[in-house]
């Protein structure tokens, strides 16, 4: 893939997700961000979006901090690209998590997350759509019972994001 900075971003994301596995398949977790990045690149051919797709779970699911990610991006890209990628990753990072909002049930957290994403940039929403598509394939194949719940949540999320 001829994307500016892609290999450095891929290494950073791979290192950040080291030891994490995909639910159901036990594959290295990094296979998911790579698949999302491939979908995004094929559809939009936007280097910054592709790199953000690779990093979309780094702040949410790893020990990497906002400051560490910003420093890495500023070493790798122009200031403009670094801030663009960082902004996309922040938009894609769940705020309404179980840890941050323990008094909210799953349905409430997902609804608030949908409302938050309604105000995300169009490009962040396009990455999120690719993320949902890739996760949906895996869940449909490996956990049809949970897929009913998951897909209903994602239909609701998409209605917030694109209406």
Predicted regions and their residues:
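Active-site helical microenvironments for divalent-metal-assisted chemistry
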Residues: 1-163
């Amino acid at each position: 893939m001829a994307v500016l900075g892609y290999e450095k971003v891929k290494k950073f994301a791979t290192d950040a997700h080291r030891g994490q596995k995909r639910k159901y398949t036990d594959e290295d977790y990094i296979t998911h961000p790579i698949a999302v990045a491939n979908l995004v690149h094929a559809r939009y051919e936007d280097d910054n979006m592709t790199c953000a797709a690779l990093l979309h779970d780094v702040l949410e699911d790893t020990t990497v901090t906002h400051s560490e990610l910003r420093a890495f991006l500023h070493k790798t890209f122009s200031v403009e690209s670094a801030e663009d990628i960082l902004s996309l990753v922040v938009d894609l990072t769940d705020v309404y998590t179980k840890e941050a909002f323990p008094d909210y049930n799953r349905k409430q957290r997902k609804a608030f997350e949908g409302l938050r994403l309604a105000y995300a940039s169009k490009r962040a929403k396009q990455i999120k759509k690719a993320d949902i598509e890739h996760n949906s394939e895996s869940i449909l194949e490996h956990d049809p019972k949970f897929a009913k719940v998951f897909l209903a949540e994602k239909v609701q999320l998409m209605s917030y994001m694109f209406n």
